């Protein structure tokens, strides 16, 4: 028997067990069922009871390993702590969040239009509660790779800010280019 283990924050735990059962299980099944468990190998022109390798893997611990690996606490220049779930884009439950800077002057309506377009292509979330900084932090903590911010400049020139989760870098792009931008950036299956 061999175990594949992962070093969790609370110590090494098994992710998968691999056991060589040889031909024991099939021989016992053959003995008690009366059914032949033979395999005919055309290359050697002979029949035999094959060996079995039994593997057991749990999705719960595997997923916990992904979350443990991705969970990060960063100290920012202002001394605050940022919790980030740095998981691959294809595992992120939400791919992009659409955030109006404020809930007035038509920014929320503009943002909802973007949300309604993007939700056809990506798992999206619309959020207008709290300050933009708190909304960014919420999205960082759940692993959302990109946040789109609709602000006053958006209403003037039809551009938005797209913020990347891991680096916090921001790009200003035309609204018409959002889908292409996300398609090029997101590593989704």
Label every model-predicted segment.
Residues 1-189:
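NTP/phosphate- and nucleic-acid-binding module
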């Amino acid at each position: 028997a061999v175990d594949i283990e992962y070093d969790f924050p609370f110590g090494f735990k098994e992710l998968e067990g691999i056991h060589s059962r040889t031909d024991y299980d099939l021989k016992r099944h053959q003995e008690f069922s009366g059914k032949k468990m033979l395999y005919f190998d055309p290359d050697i022109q002979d029949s035999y009871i094959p060996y079995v390798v039994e593997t057991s893997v749990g999705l719960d611990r595997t997923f916990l390993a992904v979350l443990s690996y991705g969970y990060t606490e960063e100290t920012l220049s202002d001394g605050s702590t940022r919790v980030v779930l740095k998981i691959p884009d294809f595992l992120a439950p939400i791919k992009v969040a659409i955030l109006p800077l404020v809930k007035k002057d038509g920014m929320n309506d503009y943002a909802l239009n973007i949300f309604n377009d993007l939700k056809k292509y990506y798992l999206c979330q619309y959020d207008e509660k709290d300050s933009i900084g708190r909304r960014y932090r919420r999205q960082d903590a759940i692993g959302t790779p990109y946040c789109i911010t609709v602000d006053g400049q958006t209403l003037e020139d039809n551009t938005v800010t797209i913020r990347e989760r891991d680096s916090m870098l921001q790009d200003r792009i035309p609204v018409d280019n959002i889908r292409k931008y996300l398609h090029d950036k997101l590593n989704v299956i």
